[in-house]
UniProtKB/Swiss-Prot annotation:
UniProt biased composition (Basic and acidic residues): 1-17, 32-52, 65-77
Family: Belongs to the small hydrophilic plant seed protein family.
Cellular component terms per the entry's GO annotation: cytosol
Induction: Up-regulated by abscisic acid.
Lineage per the UniProt record: Eukaryota, Viridiplantae, Streptophyta, Embryophyta, Tracheophyta
Name listed for the protein in its UniProt record: Carrot ABA-induced in somatic embryos 3
Positions of disulphide bridges: none
Region entry Disordered, spans: 1-113
Family matches, as PANTHER family: EM-LIKE PROTEIN GEA1, EMBRYONIC ABUNDANT PROTEIN 1
The encoding gene: CAISE3
Tissue expression profile of the protein: Expressed in embryogenic cells, somatic embryos and seeds at the later stages of development. Not detected in leaves.
Taxonomic source organism: Daucus carota
Range of residues in the leader sequence: none
Stored InterPro entries: LEA_5 (IPR038956), Sm_Hydphi_plant_seed_CS (IPR022377), Small_hydrophilic_seed_prot (IPR000389)
GO biological process: response to abscisic acid
Amino acid sequence: MASGQEKRSELDARAKQGETVVPGGTGGKSLEAQEHLAEGRSKGGHTRKEQLGTEGYQEIGTKGGETRREQMGKEGYEQMGRMGGLATKDKSGAERAEEEGIDIDQSKFRTKS
């Protein structure tokens, strides 16, 4: 069994190759950088929630979803939701849709201009 240090070294090597190894650490070029990014993003969300209160924070999330639906159009938003619903921990929604023969029109994901 790998020790904690060996595991961290392996994760650090994967992070340096561009893989996200820490949830919320997207963009970090090392394991430590990804950990710091994830922590900062989490704290930012908690701080905003404290400022707005739970109801206000939920309202902002709802408005964001509505805005995105308006930008993409109803069909594109539904297609994106369908693909998100197919996603699993191991496979993206696109991979699962392809495997299961489900037709998802990704051209509708574009923002309307």
